[in-house]
Amino acid sequence: MKKIFFLITLISIISCEQTISKSENQILIERNNTIVSKNFESYNSGDFEVFESTISDDFTFTLMGELDISGTYSYQELLKAAGAFQSLLKNGWKGNIDKIISGVNGSVIVLSGKAEGVNGEYNNDYIWLYSINEEGKVTSITEYLSDLLFVKQLYGQEICGEKKTMEQL
């Protein structure tokens, strides 16, 4: 009985002395949250010096979809494309991070953007998919957005005819 009591006491003492440490995965996830937050906020505020400090030398930005501007861009090409995008807006674009979902190799940011396009209100929703290397640098961002809203509000093109309900189909 004394041995069992001693063993329980010893286990209790040892377990009280141990501190709970974060797993390597949890540390990487928190690091990635910080990196993508800094990266997006610098892009959103136009601080491209900070933005550039968060990306790798072989960084690419891919705009998915069927737009004439859809494709993959280097950092320098992204700067030109961002300037062209801003020219379609009356007072610039501001994005808001709605959610960040991170893993050990990257993150996803769910965004909502607000702007006044040349053809009216342009409030689009976005997904930015980030890949992050071992050095903690963003190697790629892949952006998903509504092509239809983009061409209607920024290019002034009507995409489809009269809006129909399910009952009308």
Name every feature range the model reports, one short phrase each.
Residues 4-13:
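Sec-dependent N-terminal signal peptides
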Residues 16-53, 159-169:
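Short, low-complexity N-terminal intrinsically disordered segments enriched in polar/charged residues
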Residues 39, 50-52, 59, 78, ...:
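Hydrophobic pocket/interface hotspot
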Residues 53-103:
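A solvent-exposed, acidic/Ser-Thr-rich amphipathic alpha-helical stretch
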Residues 72, 119-122, 149-155:
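A short, polar/proline- and glycine-enriched secondary-structure boundary/capping micro-motif
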Residues 88, 115-123:
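Short, cysteine-centered beta-strand-loop-beta hairpins and adjacent loop/turn segments enriched
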Residues 95-101, 113-114, 125-132:
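Hydrophobic/aromatic beta-strand elements that line small-molecule binding cavities or substrate pockets
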Residues 140-169:
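Low-complexity, intrinsically disordered terminal/linker segments enriched in charged
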